Amino acid sequence: MQEHTKSSTLENAIALQKYGVGQPVRRKEDDTLVRGKGRYTDDFNLPGQAYAVVVRSTHAHGIIRSIGIDAAKALPGVLGVWTGKDLDAAGYGPFTCGLPLKSRDGSPLLQTNRQPLATDKVRFVGDPVAFVVAETLAQARDAAEAVELDIEPLPAVTDPEEAAKPGAPQLYDHIPNNVALDYHYGDMDKVNAAFASAAHVTKVDIENTRVAVVSMEPRVGLASYDKKTERYTLQVPTQGVAGNRANLAKNLKVPNEKVRILTANVGGSFGMKNINYPEYMCILYAAKTLGRPVKWLDERSTAFLSDSHGRAQKIHAELALDAEGHFLAAKLEGYGNLGAYITGVAPGPLSLNTGKNFSSVYRTPLMGVDIKVVLTNTTLMGAYRGAGRPEANYYMERLIDRAADEMGINRLTLRKRNFIKPNQIPFAASSGVTYDSGDFQAVFNKALEISDHENFAKRKKDSKKAGKLRGIAVGSYLEVTAPPSPELGKIVFEPDGSVQLITGTLDYGQGHATPFAQVLSAQLGVPFESIKLVQGDSDIVHSGNGTGGSRSITASGQAIVGAAKLVIEKGKRAAAHMLEASEADIEFEGGNFTIAGTDRSIDIMELAKRLHDGKTPEGVPDSLDVDHTSEPIASAFPNGCHVAEVEIDPETGVVQIVRYSAVNDFGTVINPLLVAGQLHGGVVQGIGQALMEHIRYDESGQPITGSLMDYALPRAEDVPNMTVGDHPVPATTNPLGSKGCGEAGCAGSLSTVVNAVLDALSEYGIKHIDMPLTSERVWRAIQDAKGKAA
């Protein structure tokens, strides 16, 4: 045993050098996915399955007079056609929002209580009104086209500001002026007094455009029902099976244990797949009614109508400063567009999250937020990468650049003057949260260094010689990650020598299996290769809060660390028995349980094997397995500074990002390779919104960007080379010191890219262009400026 232990100790030390915390280990799943061996939801089929197609409204607003289904039911292969009345009779629904948000008068968020299928009115183009199930997908499509809808059109409203005005079309009788939430934060008397005494006030009106999630695999559902056990099973892409099971069980009016959620490879989500949708209720109903599995798969064209969108705010922002440029107070006023229904966490990003993140890394003594969250005749809103954080940082950074220009203060100087200093941390921000860590000035300085900011003037001259405009922008960001919540941490030692790790978050592209294994390996000394992350089955992942809000490494990390401590406690009792020693004399280090002061030890994997192989007396654990739920931990505060340089062709308005740099503080980085991937992806997603992405509707509520022919996405040629640095200051809010990184790229890139374009256009006197800064918008702004000059 002693020789074995020495060998294993050396092996553990070598393994930690390769696979330990901080090492750039490649993702465990890469080989499978790169070779096309991943299994997405549409890859799953069940014997005897039928196919569903949803019938949707082509009107943005209207009264349902009748739904004719007889012709559709008579077509070959059709197994059933159902409307909202059928699902209402079954008692399904409604979909609600669980956030405890309140309006300024203390009243709760007004719910829309969405049913799976509309029965009285349709409220947006794409609103589900019926569904068809047939033997084949083609037959189901034919039958869906045969359903006859008689809808009396009503006036529609798509703009949240217009929707909140008296006399606007009303979506719900119980929600006056379509305002579901009149959100307020801050002491406005103090805020207004600060503005009244300010030497300078900067104001800017900003429209944060509506964007769509264009996931690699659209939404898909495969439903079945076991009559004997009265149990529903749904194969579906999600961001967390436990939470989705609970929500679905609530909608189905059954106990949680009567629902099983299965999730394999997700194919992208960015917040969109984290809620339950009407289509899932429809196929579960059909599976139970027909006694056979039913599959529904979305198409790209209908995904633009049915999937939740993101952003969509109209904001008036103000910043009050003294004569030296010190911030005195800041205000946000405006509207958030909820779309036609409220589900998931949609009101949060539009209100609470925007407010919590607005003060960013700056000393802003006072802050006021007034945002009306409004219903319109458009596709429902949801969380979208960052969920309020990129929006808030965008408003602050736009204000700072504008204030610097108006006051004649260098933009860099103004930022430096207002940074929260390290000796002021912990810092109680005016947004209501307390920052536990960070060195924002150091991050800023490093970003200037790696971007070669000091030589920008030379590069600008070179661009001018080539007939191009060149601009630069430097922007900081800070994110308040997801609110405190408990998380599952379960560890199972299998007889074959593998170690199952189970936690309530879910990997839908982040690569959790690798950093989670790195953390567990470091805690217990178990071989990295032996650790298998088990996820995507609510029968196994019985609790947990899913992936979202950049919480996975902090919440699951804490749960893993907590579970590992319990394993060590059990291991000490078992090792004391095996080594015939007192439990008090057992020490644990590097994967070995050792009798203190001796060389008698047993490796943790050997101990687990022996416990499997034999019986243990009373009081001695029969395994090292643990099932642990961690206590909620406070939010973390990832932050950073991005620098973007752009060139613009003034003859065409085409914008090219020619240099991009970012320095980030993600606290303790578990795997820098994965962090870089998350950062790059987030930056590109932000570039997409800044320069090209925009969901638009005409005045009647008809979408005019309903396909990839109309909705532009970044391509490889749009992605700049990135120079990335880091300046980690470990968080004090979790045992790993991590801060989360999944949404940081978006938070930094929106403002930086837009401000860089406006800097390039400053010689024309152009102060503002709303996103997206397409070549057409930039070209028109230049032409308008030339016309005014003439």
Question: What is the predicted function of each stretch?
Answer:
Residues L75, K85, L99, S107, ...:
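C-terminal catalytic domains of large/alpha subunits in multi-subunit enzymes
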Residues A50, A118-T119, E217-L222, K314, ...:
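Short glycine-rich loop/turn motifs
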Residues M1-A180, G619:
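Flexible, low-hydrophobicity surface segments
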Residues V191-L252, V345, L352, G471-T503, ...:
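Conserved beta-alpha junction segments in alpha/beta enzyme cores
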Residues T119-V122, P255-T263, A286-E299, A303:
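Conserved catalytic cysteine-centered active-site region
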Residues S269-G291, K295-L297, H512-L520:
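Thiamine diphosphate
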Residues Q23, E29-T32, G98, R104-T112, ...:
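Glycine-rich loop/linker segments at domain edges
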Residues Y92-T96, A143-A146, V236, R245-N247, ...:
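Short acidic, glycine/serine/threonine-rich loops at helix termini
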